[in-house]
Amino acid sequence: MKAERQTGLRNSFTTVIGRKLINTFVPSMMLTSVAGNDIFFRGLFKSPVLAFQSYRYVSILGQLKPSDGSTKSFKRLGRGPSSGLGKTSGRGQKGQKARGKVKSWFEGGQTPIYKLFPKIGFTNVGAKPLKELNLKRIQWFHDKNRLHLQPGEVLDMNKMRKLGLVTGPIKYGVKILASGKFHYNLPIALEASRASAKAIAAIEKAGGKFTARYYTPLGLRAHLNPQWFLEKRGRVPLQARPTKRRDIDFYSKEEKRGYLVMEKDKLLQDIKEAQNKGSRHFLKQNVKKSSLEIELEELSPEKDWVPVVSNSKVMNIKALDH
């Protein structure tokens, strides 16, 4: 019996586990000794129960199959008369049932997948994802003596990029977040596109100042890399002012620390003046006048100009006779 266990590829053995008689096959090379009902496996399992369960699962892997009735064979249509589903494919001749087809997404009446797992939410095509910078990273740079700022210098996005505080492409701007606010103690001025309310509170608590500044994509490129514009264009483009209502509203809020209200920008003053006058009064744009227009204004100043009064009215034939 021992010789058969040593030489045979697969042997049958019987053991009692949990008062059940189980017959299984195990490679003979795994068997080392049989003492009563205890079977020990070389280098793999200390317990015969674990060994049996492992080989039980292995034996099941070769017998996996779909549940009964869950699948069916494909019906080959239009493949000759001998199949019984040739010419008309089992639909007969003419009529509503012989024509048309089932939609590709129809699932036989069961709840379709597009109702089981519907698409939720949407992609905001107007979103402008900002680079995130936490206060703990600024504090860490200062502790490592890597935050090289002159007295009174503002830590703006250009400086953040040079120091390595923000890495990678900056497409729309930088937003300051409040992670590490309890350990932040730098009394410096920061300037970025936006900042969270908790970050603003932590910066001002440490004695610093934050300003949210608006940049267009071109203005941001000029701010981050002005040397490129000087070399390629010979000039640096001027920073544009916000034109969209939501941008003007954001950068004119004091709780957001927008630069329009923090620096008392003339644009905000003009907007408030126009709002006070009403919707009929609009801002007058400063347009460069030609020399001819200037001469005409000098010859006929606005104070001496009298508007032409129109005497037009509706007339009839009787009025014309008189």
From Swiss-Prot:
InterPro entries hit by this protein: Ribosomal_uL15, Ribosomal_uL15/eL18, Ribosomal_uL15/eL18_sf, Ribosomal_uL15_bac-type
GO molecular function, one term: structural constituent of ribosome
Ranges for region Disordered: 69-99
GO cellular component: mitochondrial inner membrane; mitochondrial large ribosomal subunit; mitochondrion
Keywords carried by this UniProt record: Mitochondrion, Ribonucleoprotein, Ribosomal protein, Transit peptide
Compositionally biased residues, Gly residues: 81-93
Compartment annotation: Mitochondrion
Principal location class: mitochondrion
Feature: transit peptide: 1-57
Keyword Secreted attributed: no
GO annotation, biological process: mitochondrial translation
Miscellaneous notes: Present with 5350 molecules/cell in log phase SD medium.
Protein task: Component of the mitochondrial ribosome (mitoribosome), a dedicated translation machinery responsible for the synthesis of mitochondrial genome-encoded proteins, including at least some of the essential transmembrane subunits of the mitochondrial respiratory chain. The mitoribosomes are attached to the mitochondrial inner membrane and translation products are cotranslationally integrated into the membrane.
Subunit architecture: Component of the mitochondrial large ribosomal subunit (mt-LSU). Mature yeast 74S mitochondrial ribosomes consist of a small (37S) and a large (54S) subunit. The 37S small subunit contains a 15S ribosomal RNA (15S mt-rRNA) and 34 different proteins. The 54S large subunit contains a 21S rRNA (21S mt-rRNA) and 46 different proteins.
Family label: Belongs to the universal ribosomal protein uL15 family.
Protein known as: Large ribosomal subunit protein uL15m
High-level lineage: Eukaryota, Fungi, Dikarya, Ascomycota, Saccharomycotina
